[in-house]
C-alpha cells in the first residue's frame, strides 16, 4: 500500500505529495503549484521529516485549514477549471480527479481541543480516523488507524471511531461510590466502547469478504483532573505537561513492544522491519478486543495527545513531541 517516490518526481512544496505532470494544483492538499514552485524545495529549506523514518528534526506545524466542504456532504468545484465534480470524484468538464476530502480533515469542537487527520504521502488513501467531543471541561478523544492490507479499512476505522465516541460521550459511571467500584465501572465502559467499535468495523463489509477491515484504537476521556484511557494496537495516548516530564500512557500491542520487553532498546525495536505489525486489533478476525485500560491524574497545564503511528513514528519519545510543541510556539491545537 506504500511506494517510494522516484528521485526525479515532482512533489508539492506545501505538503510533499507527488504531483501529476504539469499539475496546477496539488490533489492532496488542494494548494496551487506551478512549474517553478513544484520543482522547488519547501520555503524553509529544511528536509521534510517524512522523507524517511528518521525522527522529526524541524518544526512541522503549519497554519490550519478548514475541512473541505465535501466532507460536510457537498463537493467543492474542480480546482483546475471550476467545473462541477461528479459523485465519482472527477470533474464533469475537464475530467480532473478532485482531492478526496478524506485525505485531510480537521475538527475543533473547542478552541483548546482539535485534531488533524492526514493521508500519509506514501499511501494512496487516508486510513486514519478520529472523533472527539467536548462537554464543558470534559473531553473525549478517539483515534483509529486502519490496517493497510485489509479491505475498506479507511471506512471501517471511521465507523469504529464514531461508534467508540458514542459510548464514551455520556458522563462516566460513578460505580457504588468507592474508588474501586468506579474504576471497575469505567473499565467496563471502555470494554463496551471497544466492543462497539468492533461491531461497527465488522459491519463495514459483507460477511463473506476475505481479509475484512481492521484497525487500532486509542481513546481518552479527560474528566475533572483525571485522564482515563484505553488502547488496542499501536496508536498512542501521550500526556505532555508544560512543566515536567511527558508520559506515553498507552502500551503498544505490537512486535516492537515485544522486542522492547525482551530487552531491545526502543529506538532499535521501533526501527525493525516488523515494528508496526500489531498483535491486537479491532476487526472481524480479531481474537481479542479487550483493551488495556488506565488512568492518570493531571497536575498542571499541558497537552493530551492521541495519535496513530503516522505521527509517533517520527517522534516516539515524549521529549521529542514536546520539542515540536515548544518550537511551534502556539497554543492552537491545530
Regions found by a protein language model. Give the residues of each.
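PP2C/PPM-type serine/threonine phosphatase catalytic domain
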Residues: 1-334
Amino acid at each position: 500500500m506504500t511506494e517510494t517516490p522516484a528521485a526525479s518526481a515532482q512533489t508539492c512544496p506545501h505538503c510533499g505529495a507527488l504531483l501529476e505532470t504539469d499539475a496546477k494544483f496539488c490533489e492532496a492538499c488542494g494548494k496551487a503549484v506551478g512549474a517553478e514552485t513544484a520543482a522547488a524545495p519547501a520555503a524553509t529549506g529544511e528536509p521534510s521529516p517524512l522523507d524517511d523514518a528518521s525522527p522529526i528534526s524541524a518544526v512541522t506545524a503549519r497554519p490550519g485549514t478548514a475541512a473541505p466542504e465535501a466532507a460536510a456532504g457537498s463537493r467543492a468545484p474542480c480546482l483546475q477549471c471550476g467545473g462541477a465534480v461528479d459523485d465519482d470524484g472527477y470533474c464533469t468538464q475537464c475530467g480532473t480527479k478532485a482531492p478526496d476530502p478524506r485525505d485531510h480533515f480537521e475538527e475543533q469542537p473547542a478552541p483548546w481541543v482539535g485534531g488533524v487527520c492526514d493521508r500519509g504521502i506514501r499511501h494512496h488513501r487516508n486510513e486514519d480516523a478520529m472523533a472527539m467531543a467536548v462537554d464543558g471541561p470534559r473531553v473525549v478523544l478517539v483515534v483509529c488507524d486502519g490496517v493497510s492490507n485489509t479491505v475498506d479499512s479507511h471506512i471501517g476505522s471511521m465507523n469504529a471511531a464514531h461508534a467508540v465516541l458514542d459510548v464514551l460521550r455520556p458522563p462516566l459511571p460513578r460505580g457504588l461510590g468507592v474508588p474501586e467500584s468506579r474504576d471497575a465501572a469505567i473499565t467496563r465502559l471502555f470494554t463496551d466502547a471497544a466492543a462497539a467499535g468492533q461491531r461497527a468495523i465488522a459491519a463495514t463489509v459483507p460477511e463473506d469478504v476475505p481479509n475484512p477491515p481492521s484497525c487500532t484504537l486509542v481513546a481518552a476521556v479527560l474528566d475533572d483532573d483525571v485522564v482515563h484511557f484505553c488502547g488496542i494496537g499501536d496508536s498512542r495516548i501521550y500526556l505532555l505537561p508544560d512543566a515536567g516530564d511527558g508520559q506515553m500512557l498507552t502500551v503498544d500491542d505490537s512486535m516492537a513492544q515485544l522486542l522492547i520487553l525482551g530487552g531491545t532498546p526502543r529506538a532499535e525495536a521501533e526501527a525493525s522491519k516488523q515494528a508496526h505489525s500489531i498483535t491486537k486489533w479491532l476487526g472481524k478476525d480479531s481474537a481479542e478486543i479487550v483493551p488495556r485500560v488506565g488512568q492518570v491524574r493531571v497536575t498542571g497545564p499541558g497537552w493530551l495527545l492521541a495519535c496513530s503511528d503516522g505521527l509517533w513514528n517520527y517522534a516516539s519519545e515524549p521529549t521529542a513531541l514536546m520539542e515540536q510543541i515548544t518550537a511551534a510556539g502556539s497554543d492552537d491545537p491545530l
